Amino acid sequence: MNKKQKEEFFQRLESGEGCNFRKDEKNETIWRCYGGNDKRFSRLILKRMKVSKIEANKFLKKCDDNGWHCDCEILFNAEEPIMGEK
């Protein structure tokens, strides 16, 4: 994935298409994530972006290898290191 695709992926994962980060009535940040090893939003977004299956699996394996096992862990921990790659 190129840098532009990675940026788009992280934006979409944070949006209503993915984890849906938002403020609740107490102004606290809430989101949805199924935890564990569930990356359903990441997989769906990569598919919708038409990222090849090989490239998507490579990206998701890299996430697993770094301990980013679910969608919210990818957002909380992966964006900076992945976007910083050359």
Spans of model-derived segments:
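Short, compact, well-ordered microdomains
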Residues: 53-86
